[in-house]
């Protein structure tokens, strides 16, 4: 990504985050969650990615992308939403979400805002599947 950006002069915006539990739960965090609270570890990982870069690349994300399950935000997913909201509050990184079939958008926004994320830095995605106009 860095090489392509440097060679082309294009500004490439990298995302960090996690997909919903049903398809995007990394085995490491699922196993760790079974052993105890992972909230601090997820927060520190997100914070480090934003301030120092992802892994050893030096590439910092310009946005977080998060997802929740259909009709619910699981406890596991909530850890990632809360960590991202906290890092966003501290560093200003925007958050884009993914909804399953247009469900949980308002709940995602409420959760992120309740954790201190700036509503002007949140975009709820994939709401086209929702028939609820309220």
Question: What label would you give each PLM region?
Answer:
Residues 3-5, 28-29, 109-114:
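Short low-complexity, flexible loop/linker segments enriched in glycine and/or proline
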């Amino acid at each position: 990504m860095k090489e392509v950006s440097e060679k082309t002069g294009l500004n490439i915006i990298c995302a960090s985050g996690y997909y919903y539990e049903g398809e995007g739960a990394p085995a490491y965090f699922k196993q760790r969650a079974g052993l105890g609270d992972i909230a601090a570890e997820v927060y520190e990982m997100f914070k480090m990615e934003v301030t120092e870069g992802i892994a050893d690349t030096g590439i910092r994300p310009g946005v977080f992308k998060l997802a929740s399950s259909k009709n619910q935000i699981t406890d596991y997913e909530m850890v990632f939403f809360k960590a991202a909201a906290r890092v966003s509050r501290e560093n200003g990184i925007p958050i884009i979400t993914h909804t399953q079939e247009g469900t949980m958008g308002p709940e995602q926004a409420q959760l992120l805002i309740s954790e201190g994320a700036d509503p002007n830095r949140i975009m709820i995605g994939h709401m086209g599947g929702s028939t609820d106009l309220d």
